[in-house]
Swiss-Prot record:
Enzyme class: transferase
Protein name stated in the entry: 4-diphosphocytidyl-2-C-methyl-D-erythritol kinase
Domain of life (superkingdom): Bacteria
Keywords: ATP-binding, Isoprene biosynthesis, Kinase, Nucleotide-binding, Transferase
Pathway: Isoprenoid biosynthesis; isopentenyl diphosphate biosynthesis via DXP pathway; isopentenyl diphosphate from 1-deoxy-D-xylulose 5-phosphate: step 3/6
Lineage: Bacteria, Pseudomonadati, Pseudomonadota, Betaproteobacteria, Burkholderiales
Catalyzed reactions: 4-CDP-2-C-methyl-D-erythritol + ATP = 4-CDP-2-C-methyl-D-erythritol 2-phosphate + ADP + H(+)
NCBIfam families the record matches: ispE, PRK14608.1
Enzyme Commission code(s) on record: 2.7.1.148
Length: 293
């Protein structure tokens, strides 16, 4: 990343994985209570921010299928601008890397990187807690990325507690299918009564188990998604023959963990022709963590 008084270049918006995802209840307003552990990855979209003197917020990159004013990046910048009353503006360029509808948090991460970067570029110096309260208005996953640490999440995903996770390498395989999150959450067959667990439960079973993530929990959405989307089921089955595999979020991406980059790359090399896979290292902290206190 490069930093100047007029611009911030090469700001990573990291992907996340749900190492497990349990749905423990449903609220009267339709939202679901969940428990999960969010893992940051050193892989994601890259954003570039340049100051404007006319006060306007503009997206300088076309993102197919995402109109500018509904883009979470633009919405995040306008929300921060309205909240603080700053006269500053910004041009935002986005180098998209993460697929949409994949369970990797791409749009949410872009929004969080925007909040953190503009907190620095616009010299706002808002505390992290204040940025997180804004992030809630943009989506359930955005507060986690502003939080900036690997986390045990509860509630609708906004109750976060830092967890220390070992360094791992991941192979993430994304089938060519878009899984609408709302469709999965509304499915009658979705498990909504998983027994609550604790951070201690998770940490006790994940630290050194060779069968991890199999050794702890599951993704409650996986069975519904694989029953509806054969492409996801095919990836889960194939990857599971290489290493314990699990879907992240509401899909469609599926991941497996490895102890080394070499192991992950070797698994990637075996992918069937035409499949989309990426090897990524775990992160302990968001690259822009220092941009809020």
């Amino acid at each position: 990343m490069t930093d100047s008084t007029r611009s911030l270049r090469n700001c990573l918006a990291p992907a996340k994985l749900n190492l497990f995802l349990h749905i423990t209840g449903r609220r009267p307003n339709g939202y679901h209570d969940l428990q999960s552990v969010f893992q940051l990855l050193n892989w994601g979209d890259t954003l570039h921010f340049t100051l404007r003197d006319d006060g306007k917020v503009a997206r300088a990159t076309d993102v197919p299928g995402v109109p500018e004013q509904s883009d979470l990046v633009v919405r995040a910048a306008n929300l921060l601008k309205a909240h603080t009353g700053t006269a500053a503006g910004v041009d935002i360029e986005i180098d998209k890397c993460l697929p949409m509808g994949a369970g990797l948090g791409g749009g949410s991460s872009d929004a969080a990187t925007t909040l953190l970067a503009l907190n620095r570029l616009w010299q706002l110096d808002l505390p992290r807690a204040e940025l997180q309260s804004l992030a809630v208005k943009l989506g359930a996953d955005v507060p986690f990325f502003v939080f900036g640490k690997n986390a045990f999440a509860e509630g609708i995903g906004e109750e976060l507690a830092e967890v220390e996770l070992p360094t791992r390498w991941f192979l993430v395989v994304t089938p060519r299918v878009h899984v609408p999150t709302a469709e999965i959450f509304s499915d009658e067959l979705l498990t909504r009564d998983s027994k609550p667990v604790t951070i201690t439960d998770f940490l006790a079973q994940q630290s050194s188990d060779a069968r991890w993530p199999d050794s702890f929990g599951r993704n409650d959405m996986q069975q519904v998604v694989t029953s509806k989307y054969a492409e996801v089921a095919q990836v889960v089955k194939w990857l599971y023959n290489v290493a314990p595999a699990r879907m992240t979020g509401s899909g469609a991406s599926v991941f497996a963990a490895f102890q080394s980059k070499q192991q992950a790359e070797a698994a990637k090399a075996q992918l069937p022709a035409g499949w989309n896979g990426a090897v990524a290292e775990s992160l302990n902290e968001h690259p822009l963590f220092a941009f809020a206190s």
